[in-house]
Amino acid sequence: MLQENAPAESESDTNSTPARAAWSTENVNVETRALLDRDSNAFLHQSVSTPCLTAIKKAEGIYIEDVGGRRYIDFHGNNVHHIGYGHPRLKRAISEQMDALPFAPRRFTCEPAVQLAEKLAAITPGNLSKVLFTTGGSDAIEVAIKVARAATGRFKTLSFWDAFHGAGFGAASVGGEALFRGKPHGPLMPGAEHVAPFGSFNCPYGGRNAQESGDACARMIDYVLTREGDFAAFIAEPIRAVPYVPPPGFWRKVREACDRTGTLLIFDEIPTGLGKTGRMFSCEHDGVTPDILVLGKGLGGGILPIAAAVCRPELDVGGAWAFGHYTHEKNPVTTRAALETIQIIEDEGLVENAARVGQCALERLESWKDRFTEVVDVRGRGFLMGIELAGNDDKRPAKAIAERTLYNALENGLSFKTTMGNVLTLTPPLVTSQAQMDQALDILETALAAARNA
């Protein structure tokens, strides 16, 4: 029997609030309602999924279009739409590969799979050069945990509360969101320990600013790793996708603590890798190379699911065992899609675009602090941005205003998500132009103004 009071959703907007019901009543037509009802009858219900918001029939470039004909700029996209939806080059490459070689069964390799592994070794930082492919980021996290256990002879992990690393059993265990590890899931993976994350506003360590928070968090990680001394890995996103930007020196301190205690450092770049933060990999901002780097989401170009764990060669110690023997591990179509996606990102200068347009966007968002007292923090890098809303006097999260802003924006053609209930989180495709960004922020500014005055 499940508890009646479910945990507050932190991964995205809720699907059971009065605001969602009101939006559906006013914005869902008869045709869409029929499809939503069929969806509700066919799928298991779960938070932030079924029951769904609406139904879409088209996705192209930075836009999605619902069954009723409303078009949205998609600044959510589950972080898969780096090159925009339906990129012509990607669709052509997939079609060609399906004609040439649609599948590679177990025991066989193929040219696209090897090329992708070599490409990832070439573009990832440091000497990361040994790869395993999976069909999703959660599975790639599982592979990373297994490799870390095998290489160190240890089983314990350390990670952040409030982090998301996937919905699989091991990934949910190292994650820190109640939605994915709460009461109905039962006992999770043994040895998965957590510390409070760094922050800036309402820091769990009591820091007055981002630097103080980061310093306190780094000391706590150092303390736990040293005190127990037997962790296989510390697992984290190099920039928390809420988002929170690590203060200068934070990851160098963590890297030093890991090295001193024999703990492997695993960076989860599933949402941030391949240019999202204005660098090919988010960890490059901080000059720290992990022992294992995990990729997913945008790697398949927003069409096909593929993820990867990229490791130091010294971690290739389990040749007699199976760490990631997946049916589609070396699928020629998904690996060809990933190769083409990376090539498009490089050819079209999309990493540089995210850095340039993202910086302009962050400067504009920062100016909102002067207009909106509820905007207490603006943070991000490149095309990963967060606007935190809270009461000006009591600093309590302004969740109602955030939710109203979300639905106001949807009504006017902008889709994004809220995280932790009060952070407006924008993750645009890397192909977003300055003009498109300006249009999206115009919609968001109007939506926020209306929400706070409601």
Give the location of each predicted region.
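Conserved N-terminal phosphate-binding loop of PLP-dependent enzymes in the Aspartate aminotransferase
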Residues: 2-454
